[in-house]
């Protein structure tokens, strides 16, 4: 394995750069978007306007770009890196690449917020790094780091990355080429997000996992690999990644810019890494789910203290302290950026107050920590620096929580609060709490949602018209869509991009064939993307612009979701819940049906179809059931996925009309991954 020399990236002032158009898209199924005769509107990607250039220049006045502390931290401990890193999947598409980000080796262009550009440059520093004696990280092989802690007979792995098929295996291969072979004695998965568990099958095989029926100490002594996770982990994995998996994956395209080209006018970084990996996800059920809020154990000679932090960045999450190394692993509770209290891909909102409290609790529990490291970005060293890092991070979440509630009690709505609130000046200037991933505006709305829900108490909003109907009514009242477009174009020339995007998107929802509205909306969104400091916001704006111009016709064909490795880890009850979600109630609402479900590898259930609603009862088989079917647990997923071959192979109708069973199978919905978002 060749080693490249560490490249110290210099982050300097903005340099005007020649702008090139985004990669030309393939033919799309969306309405063709052509230039407006009089307005000059067209479907091409645009350079930054002067308003955008000025907005990005103002960032230099806000932040101290001469402060290279984070750059030094990102480089510290570097040991080795490959000359090239470019992992390709089906049809030659990049699954993970650092090579494509070579364009970052210069000053920020007009089309990028210079603060986000710096973050992207630091995330382009990749390879093997030493955190402290005996603790190493492979960074930049995935959006998340894979951490290796040396034990007496091998390695403890902290988090696994996203992809078993691609990134995790490559990271392990690279690590072993530098550090030698060694058995993985334990895997600690810090929380229930796919970029932390999805690579596990690239590190270990299912047959290597310790006996789940054994206590943890016996698992660790067995010679097998223990998989240690926080309380509630398995339930959180399934509910978040399977129940709304289709919608979440579609929205993730916007958050992570998965379909955008790499480049100055495309995707840069999402703050916690360059981008997400969405292929080759694996899942192995944990062997030990922690119960105690704080507990200590010894893993192959390494003392570890676990601190559970539920409801923070994930419903199930935990920090880990290695007292002999004075090294504090903060999972994703600290990440070198302002994180999401609500993630744009969609998930349960997080508890800002609890998040801050668990960080300060970690400070109290582990006051001797001399290095803090985590699942994303780079460590921070030195006892005082560690304390300051934790304090500033906790203070940001606590401020957002407390100030939002103050304004709520003064009668303001979430949208109003988001436009009012601003971080204290000293916190605003801290590089590692900048808004690279989460933002102050959408985090405020998350706090509002947690305490007050969606309703702002204005009864006008109790039963609003759906967007297309509202848009058509509004356009009818306005009377002349052409005149609206003229005014919007004039406002675009004034740099009022948010308003232009809003009003033109209303025109699109009233008439998706309005080509000029699509073009102008895309142009406005593109400028908002160029100005965004949050990588997630930049991606969302640019993907929306892309789809308005091109549709989704050239996106890769979507496989049926919800039947992958993660879904197969569900227990029978959770699978039945998922069946109820996938079942199209309208097709069965006139039917009442009872089914004995005899599972060969789990408890039996009585299923009741009541006006199209699926209810189930454990260990309650009925002699009067309309159907009796037997199958292994995985057969439930054969039904939900509509896989006729597996249905025939796995499922036996023991009693009743097989045609009735087929009716049940035919009621399962087939989700379209590429459902519309920016248009009706």
Annotate the PLM regions.
Residues 121-182, 318-322, 326-332:
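Conserved beta-strand hairpin/beta-sheet module of binuclear metal-dependent hydrolase folds
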